[in-house]
Amino acid sequence: MKKPFHHQAGFTLVEMMIVLMIISILLLVALPSMTKNNEVAGDKGCEATVKLLQTQVHAYEIDHDRLPTNLDALKREGYVEHTECPNGKKLTLRNGVVAISE
């Protein structure tokens, strides 16, 4: 004997619209905080890069008895691989001090 076919109703168009509206509202609330967190992470990454480069400037000075003329000298000599921040900000070296370019 066959089982009777039970008709299961799906979502109506109105129900789907309500679900999509709720998801959209949740995204509108969540996206700004995620964007802010990305900016904070980028700034922290830049601060860490500055500290790393400053340490390598001191190592260069110890090895060569003079300060490097620019950050590219650190890269050429193999002290670092990158001389810019992860968030794209440029860095400069003046009188042995690494700083973020304005």
Swiss-Prot record:
The residues that cross the membrane are: 11-31
This protein's membrane topology, according to the annotation, is: Single-pass membrane protein
Carrying N-methylphenylalanine, the residues are 11
Compartment(s) of residence: Cell membrane; Cell surface; Fimbrium
Spell out the family assignment given in the record's similarity comment.
Belongs to the ComGC family.
Q: How does it assemble?
A: The transformation pili are flexible filaments, consisting mainly of the major pilin ComGC and smaller amounts of the minor pilins, including at least ComGD, ComGF and ComGG. Homodimer. Forms higher-order multimers. Interacts with ComGG; the interaction is probably direct.
Recorded protein name is: Competence protein ComGC
Q: Which organism is it from?
A: Halalkalibacterium halodurans (strain ATCC BAA-125 / DSM 18197 / FERM 7344 / JCM 9153 / C-125) (Bacillus halodurans)
- What's the name of its gene? comGC
